[in-house]
């Protein structure tokens, strides 16, 4: 048994379960891995980056049982005091994380049509964890809850109001757990009072979003009712004129389902470049003179800068611009190009700081004379989920959120 209690963090997807085990004392990761293909005949489990091992049975519970076996091998199973679950969509029913009970699970089930690929999988993880860890407190942490502080003028779509009332059609926003964690770290790094501050956070990865955080609260965000709206992404289009989609349908005969697939899986960096959704591949291709890779990168940057500028308008003042996510943390090129676009804000860059590798971690990358502080802060959604579980489970770690 481990010296301190541990928190098991679970992210149940449509075909996978990602997990990590964190020490409740310091919230440090002790173990992490992923079970993939869990609904197929070729399910595997990889722990701490080791080669995948085939699983005998398919399904959520057998996969979680295999994860339990790995914990048992390391004498961690009896130390699991709390389980934290990432839940994709909390609708407007969850303003914050919640202890999982029958009522909470029923509410999640009720709003699952808003995110059918994710929420039902999240529920399957909760049900399986209940069977395998009877009596252990579970906590649901919602990707949308941080954005429940948006004012109506920020979350409403300019459609007939009845669609919001009757069908829940509105902006919900996503990446909330990441934006919340990074905003808390940013107040610490930049020496700001959470109660009097203005930040724009750019979470840039295969999925990407912008969030305006005023006095510690989300006041605007780029993703909408689904994660499709806003920035151009790896394979998602981001903002597109609906009239353009209607025109495509009229010319090609494609259905709504066809168009939905196209804007979700065939667009973005992949769609423009015709090469890849992976920015690392596109940066290499750009250096080799690939014109459409260059065009994809420039379009990506333009959209990011435009959204950062627009989100700054939701703040009373702009103290900091923060980059996070796989691209935000690791691409010096994208950060430089975005901040060059934002020179209207009086931003200057410190190239030596910007060009450091992602492993350099948290750092300020703006110049000393910059009117706005710009920084890189690695996100840590697993830690945020674990901290929420510890807070609600009343097991306080020796570290604070920031």
Curated annotation (Swiss-Prot):
Site (described: Transition state stabilizer): 175, 236
A Gene Ontology biological process term: acetate metabolic process
Record: residues binding ATP: 11, 18, 175, 203-207, 278-280, 326-330
Keywords on record: ATP-binding, Kinase, Magnesium, Metal-binding, Nucleotide-binding, Transferase
Keyword Protease among record annotations: no
Keyword field contains Repressor: no
InterPro entries given in the database record: Ac/propionate_kinase, Aliphatic_acid_kin_short-chain, Aliphatic_acid_kinase_CS, ATPase_NBD, Propionate_kinase
Reaction(s) catalysed (UniProt annotation): propanoate + ATP = propanoyl phosphate + ADP
Cofactors, names only: Mg(2+)
UniProt EC number: 2.7.2.15
Top EC class for this record: transferase
Binding site for substrate: 86
Family: Belongs to the acetokinase family. TdcD subfamily.
Function of the molecule: Catalyzes the conversion of propionyl phosphate and ADP to propionate and ATP.
Name of the protein in question: Propionate kinase
Organism ancestry: Bacteria, Pseudomonadati, Pseudomonadota, Gammaproteobacteria, Enterobacterales
């Amino acid at each position: 048994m481990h010296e301190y209690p541990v928190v098991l963090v679970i992210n149940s997807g449509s075909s996978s379960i990602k997990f990590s085990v964190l020490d409740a004392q310091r919230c440090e990761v002790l173990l992490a891995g992923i079970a993939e293909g869990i609904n197929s005949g070729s399910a595997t489990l990889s722990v701490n980056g080791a080669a995948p091992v085939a699983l005998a049975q398919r399904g959520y519970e057998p996969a979680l049982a295999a994860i339990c076996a790995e914990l048992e091998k390391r004498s961690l199973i009896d130390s699991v005091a709390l389980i934290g679950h990432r839940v994709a969509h909390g609708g407007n029913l969850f303003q914050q994380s919640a202890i999982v009970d029958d009522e909470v699970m029923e509410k999640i089930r009720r709003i699952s049509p808003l995110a059918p690929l994710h929420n039902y999988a999240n529920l399957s993880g909760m049900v399986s964890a209940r069977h395998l860890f009877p009596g252990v407190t579970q906590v649901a942490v919602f990707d949308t809850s941080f954005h429940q502080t948006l004012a109506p003028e920020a979350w409403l779509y300019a459609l007939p109001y009845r669609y919001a009332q009757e069908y829940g059609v509105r902006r919900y926003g996503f990446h909330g757990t990441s934006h919340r964690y990074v905003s808390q770290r940013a107040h610490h790094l930049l020496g700001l009072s959470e109660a009097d501050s203005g930040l724009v956070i750019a979470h840039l990865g295969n999925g990407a979003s912008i969030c305006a955080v005023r006095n510690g609260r989300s006041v605007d965000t780029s993703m909408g009712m689904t994660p499709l709206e806003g920035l151009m992404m790896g394979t998602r289009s981001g903002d597109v004129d609906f009239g353009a989609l209607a025109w495509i349908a009229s010319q090609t005969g494609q259905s709504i389902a066809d168009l939905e697939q196209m804007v979700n899986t065939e667009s973005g960096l992949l769609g423009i470049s015709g090469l890849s959704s992976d920015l690392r591949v596109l940066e290499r291709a750009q250096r080799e003179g690939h014109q459409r890779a260059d065009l994809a990168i420039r379009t990506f940057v333009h959209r990011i800068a435009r959204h950062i500028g627009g989100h700054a308008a939701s703040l009373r003042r702009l103290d900091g611009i923060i980059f996070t996510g796989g691209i935000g943390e690791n691409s010096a090129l994208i950060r430089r190009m975005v901040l060059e676009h934002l020179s209207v804000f009086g931003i200057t860059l410190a190239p030596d700081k910007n060009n450091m590798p992602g492993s350099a971690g948290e750092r300020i990358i703006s110049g000393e004379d910059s009117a706005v502080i710009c920084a890189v802060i690695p996100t840590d959604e697993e830690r945020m989920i674990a901290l929420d579980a510890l807070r609600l489970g009343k097991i306080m770690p020796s570290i604070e959120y920031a």
